[in-house]
Amino acid sequence: MSDNLLNGANGASTVSQFQEKVKDLGVSLHDFTAYYPSSLDTVSASLRPISDPSSDGAFKKIKTEGLGGSVFGSSIAGVTNTPARLCSLERPESERLNSRRRHRTTFTQEQLQELDAAFQKSHYPDIYVREELARITKLNEARIQVWFQNRRAKHRKHEKQLNKAINPPHSFLSNPANTLMRQGMYPAALNRDGFWYQSYQRPMPYPTASPSYSNSFTNPIANFGHSITSFQADDEFYQKSLALRMTTTPSAATAATSLANINYQQTQPSEASTNPPSI
């Protein structure tokens, strides 16, 4: 009888202590809008009686093992059973794989014709054109914008392939500009390379110049002016090349001939003075 009275007194004291602890906890958390316990240990510590754990009390049945089936118990085991996770686990595997795939729009032939006609007019349609296409094709405007982006990328790829087919990569010697640099501007080299001059049916003779020399230096361009005007070239390229050859090559010959004439005139008086005429 005395043991029962002692157990009842211990239970009453435990309840009173728990009520005081809850009251103190409510006062301390009065200024906070929300309180989230960090772990299950904090919650279990707030609900565990202060008395000896071996004693029989009113809260003896509150144990950590009893929470194994709850959300807190599953979080202790390392598995977080959130509602989204539970729903995903309940769905079959085929539905989960389909949800991960991108949604592809299948266009009809009439829709593709309308979109291609608009693309031929403008590769970058404005908002009004897209709205009109959405009304005609019964498509979403975002789908139309994505279709134009893919169509522009396909068009650029097609242009690159076409340019590679028209202009294949050549070597250094097969490049026309490099061939022109290699062959120079002399007629012998021009006659050996028939690639550039297949369109000309008659040969292009080199102009012969016969300048008149005098005692003074003369301008080589003036000496060859008559031959340049009489020569009828079929292309501006030949005129420039001939003018370049005539201004560079004959100038040295003209200067050498003029110097030879001057030296010849200077030697004639000396010979006349050394050999007096016989009477």
From Swiss-Prot:
**GO terms for biological process?**
axon development; axon guidance; larval locomotory behavior; neuron differentiation; neuron fate specification; positive regulation of transcription by RNA polymerase II; regulation of gene expression; regulation of transcription by RNA polymerase II
The record places the DNA-binding region at 100-159
Molecular function terms from GO: DNA-binding transcription factor activity, RNA polymerase II-specific; RNA polymerase II transcription regulatory region sequence-specific DNA binding
Q: Does the keyword Nucleus apply?
A: yes
Q: What is the effect of changing residue 146 to E?
A: In e270; axon outgrowth, pioneering and pathfinding defects; mechanosensory defects
Organism superkingdom = Eukaryota
Q: Where in the cell is it found?
A: Nucleus
Write out the entry's keywords from A to Z: DNA-binding, Homeobox, Nucleus, Transcription, Transcription regulation
Q: Pfam families from the xrefs?
A: Homeodomain
Q: Which GO terms describe its cellular component?
A: nucleus
What does the tissue specificity note say? Answer: Expressed in 40 neurons located in the head, which can be divided into 15 anatomically distinct classes; unc-42-expressing neurons are unrelated by lineage but are synaptically interconnected.
* InterPro entries per record: HD, Homeobox_CS, Homeodomain-like_sf, Paired_Homeobox_TFs
UniProt keyword DNA-binding, yes or no: yes
- Where is this protein chiefly located? nucleus
SUPFAM superfamilies per record: Homeodomain-like (SSF46689)
**What PANTHER family has UniProt attached to this entry?**
HOMEOBOX PROTEIN ARISTALESS (PTHR24329), HOMEOBOX PROTEIN UNC-42 (PTHR24329:SF577)
- What family does the Swiss-Prot or TrEMBL record give for this protein? Belongs to the paired homeobox family.
Q: What does this protein do?
A: Probable transcription factor. Required for initial outgrowth and pathfinding of axon growth cones along the ventral nerve cord (VNC). Involved in specifying neuron identity, in concert with nuclear hormone receptor family member fax-1, or with transcription factors unc-3, cfi-1, or hlh-34, perhaps acting via positive feedforward loops. Establishes electrically- and chemically-interconnected neuron circuits, acting by modulating the expression of neurotransmitter pathway genes, neurotransmitter receptors, neuropeptides, and neuropeptide receptors.
Q: What is this protein called?
A: Homeobox protein unc-42
Lineage of source species: Eukaryota, Metazoa, Ecdysozoa, Nematoda, Chromadorea
